[in-house]
């Protein structure tokens, strides 16, 4: 089989690899049918990642099961979402919802980067899934795999960034400072779940147009809005934008930072102390809340397909992926996306 390999800045190529095989009765082998780059993949391809190449890239896809161990509940033909992080489902951390911190594997074991071992990437023709029953989530009927190609990471992350807060604070005012798909998904979910105001900040006019289609107000840039928002979501990976988000919070407000901050920076700690805000900077325990996120997607209240910036053939991955796109989706001619 082939796996797409990141080899240098803005360069990826197909490389041959052995076909994966079942290593236990709980494994499954899947073939991605619709896959998308995560926002962090764009940073990696631009040369900003912390890990030098080469390595198999990709950690967002909807896949079709092609083989499964005898103890698995999955069967060939099932359409599934593959969470980005490897988790066993039974250790103490997994049982507590901390699936990104599973103790059965090295810390931060994941698809798409050789952190915590080498698990391959989801831009591969075939992928072995350990603990398939714990990891894989069936794609609900009626959902388009192309629209949900990001359900491994960015889509459920956006759900986690806003949905629990709006449950605790109905009608909250939401600030989104973004540079990619995560912030746009947040706008859609926040609107669907009853935010009283959503302001989306992004210098890209095409991104702002999508946010406006979701019912958000937009701006190319802003100065801090004193006590303006109950929740701020920052997904730029830029510390000045994170500082703006923090300085725009109402007393006891909450800031979710979903940007990958590869560079250090200084935060307004005294202002944060005086306002009593909470800042969370965290990777997502996606498997724990993926079913709830997919339930919202299946309800028809949201439209993640609007964020898809183009649909491309699987064979175009090496040429198209390194280009600048918001959320391209790559589909397999040999693995139809229909059920």
Please give the residue ranges for each predicted region:
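C-terminal hydrophobic helical "lid"/dimerization subdomain
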Residues: 1-3, 287-339
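Short N-terminal strand-loop motif that marks the start
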Residues: 1-62, 124-127, 131, 333-339
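Glycine-rich beta-strand-centered segment in the early N-terminal region that forms part
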Residues: 20-35, 48-95, 120, 140
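Short, well-ordered loop/turn sites that connect or cap secondary structure elements
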Residues: 74-75, 168, 249
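Mid-domain Rossmann-like dinucleotide-binding core that forms the NAD(H)/NADP(H) cofactor-binding site
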Residues: 79, 138-221
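NAD(P)H dinucleotide-binding glycine-rich loop of Rossmann-like/cofactor-binding domains
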Residues: 90-177
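Glycine-rich phosphate-binding loop and adjacent beta-alpha segment
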Residues: 195, 239-299, 332-339
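A short acidic, Gly/Pro-enriched loop at the edge of an enzyme's catalytic core
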Residues: 224-232
